[in-house]
């Protein structure tokens, strides 16, 4: 560090000019504390895109990072921070929880940013509605993940003379061929959330869009405990025979690596798995295909990563918050962030030229499903965590314990729905 001498007045003048310029540049800079779960791998790489954008705007990014497997811990810590009057600037939370926070009056209104950036025009209505409370924006979306993907190791598929399945009959025929050839047909982890994603895929593929909405959006007890759900559960359990030995708590990345190494043939997983497959394609020559899960080729089950924006006190933090909201939905950030994340831009009209074929396919399918009315939210998008948690536990228990009947599981699903105290969502 260079020190200035009091014997050099010209040095003082230059220093004061430098300080003045620095103060002018940072007069509106603020700290942006963000609660998120993007702490490893490609998620962390994608988060760096957001950090860099905010740093270019002169703001300081502060991570409030929590493990995605923290169960109820993140919400507990967030609640404690909010109640103490010291909330983070933004928090990555699910859309039903956004509505809960909004009803408590602790979220910031960013309609001024939304109007300036034309959010009502550049966002799909199914997404923009979820970001609003009583007609005002209180949150900002980052991306769209497709949930109903089936990933296939094409070398394994060719070796067993299998075909890319579009129906469940075709799927089980392919799975049987892979199993007989000594492969694990379906790579699957042993975590409850993975069990539930697989179940969602089966429910949509077996029951169809109307059934899915009745069961998991409107919580119709006849759908949750009827003959179609019984068929869904039967199909779901049948897959278990092709998943190999289930290891409780096995991370999804370890399951995906089975596909990469050629030990497994297929995997049901959202498109956050894609960067891993793309890396393997580049480094190890992996040949993989991404196709809609069986039975739901025209449907698109989606999840959106979103940030609730909390009321903050200082003008500098408010400025940082508004800049964050604007930057997150800017075309440039949408493109770079989603290229790293494996998802697709939530903003309409972003150029997908640099995206891989799966990204382009996902974007086209999302638009087509929106037009056809076959766009459905993932359960995590549709239901509050308290209900989703009970349903997830019931489905995971059914998967891991063959002694549990489909009838008992359906009763647990209905009980979860009846215990739901869901105030009507207001947009």
Positions of PLM-derived features:
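Extracytoplasmic/periplasmic substrate-recognition and gating elements
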Residues: 30, 52, 56, 160, ...
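Extracytoplasmic "Venus flytrap"/periplasmic binding protein-like
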Residues: 32, 56-125, 129-132, 158-166, ...
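Extracytoplasmic "Venus flytrap"
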Residues: 32-49, 66-69, 379-382
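A structural signal for short loop-to-beta-strand junctions that line the ligand-binding cleft
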Residues: 80-81, 87-89, 119-155, 184-185, ...
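Periplasmic solute-binding protein
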Residues: 98-106, 127-166, 172, 191-216, ...
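Short, solvent-exposed loop/beta-turn-alpha elements that line the ligand-binding surface or hinge
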Residues: 111-124, 206-231, 279-283, 292-299
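Long, aromatic- and glycine/proline-rich binding clefts that accommodate carbohydrate-like moieties
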Residues: 126-128, 288-291, 338-393, 397, ...
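Glycine-centered hinge/linker elements that transmit conformational signals in sensory
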Residues: 175, 217-248
């Amino acid at each position: 560090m260079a020190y200035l001498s009091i014997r050099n007045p010209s040095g003082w003048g230059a220093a004061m000019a430098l300080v003045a310029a620095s103060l002018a540049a940072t007069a509106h800079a603020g700290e942006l504390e963000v609660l998120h779960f993007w702490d490893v791998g490609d998620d962390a790489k994608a988060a760096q895109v957001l950090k860099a954008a905010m740093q270019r705007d002169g703001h300081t990014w502060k991570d409030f990072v929590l493990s995605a497997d923290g169960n109820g811990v993140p919400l507990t810590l967030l609640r404690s921070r909010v109640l103490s009057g010291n909330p983070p600037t933004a928090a990555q939370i699910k859309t039903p929880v956004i509505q809960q926070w909004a009803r408590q009056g602790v979220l910031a209104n960013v309609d001024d940013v939304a109007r300036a950036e034309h959010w009502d025009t550049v966002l799909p209505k199914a997404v923009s509605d979820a970001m609003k409370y009583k007609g005002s924006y209180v949150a900002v979306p980052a991306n769209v993940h497709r949930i109903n993907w089936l990933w296939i190791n094409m070398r394994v598929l060719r070796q067993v003379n299998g075909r890319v399945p579009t129906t469940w009959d075709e799927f089980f025929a392919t799975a049987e061929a892979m199993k007989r050839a000594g492969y694990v047909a379906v790579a699957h982890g042993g975590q409850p959330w993975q069990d539930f994603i697989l179940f969602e895929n089966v429910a949509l593929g077996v029951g169809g869009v109307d059934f899915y909405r009745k069961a998991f959006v409107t919580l119709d007890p006849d759908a949750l405990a009827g003959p179609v759900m019984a068929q869904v559960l039967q199909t779901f359990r049948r897959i278990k025979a092709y998943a190999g030995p289930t290891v409780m708590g096995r991370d999804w990345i370890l399951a995906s690596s089975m596909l990469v190494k050629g030990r497994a043939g297929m995997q049901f997983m959202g498109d956050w798995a894609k960067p891993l497959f793309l890396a393997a394609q580049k480094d190890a020559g992996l040949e993989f295909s991404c196709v809609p899960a069986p039975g739901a080729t025209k449907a698109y089950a989606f999840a959106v990563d979103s940030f609730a924006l909390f009321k903050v006190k200082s003008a500098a933090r408010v400025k940082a918050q508004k800049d964050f909201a604007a930057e997150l939905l800017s075309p440039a950030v949408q493109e770079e962030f989603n290229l790293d994340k494996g998802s697709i831009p939530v903003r309409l009209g972003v150029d997908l030229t640099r995206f891989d074929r799966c990204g382009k396919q996902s974007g086209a399918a999302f638009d087509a499903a929106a037009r056809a009315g076959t766009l459905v939210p993932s359960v995590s998008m549709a239901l509050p965590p308290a209900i989703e948690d009970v349903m997830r536990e019931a489905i995971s228990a059914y998967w891991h314990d063959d002694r549990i009947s489909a009838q008992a599981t359906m009763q647990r699903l209905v009980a979860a729905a009846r215990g739901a105290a869901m105030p009507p969502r207001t947009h």
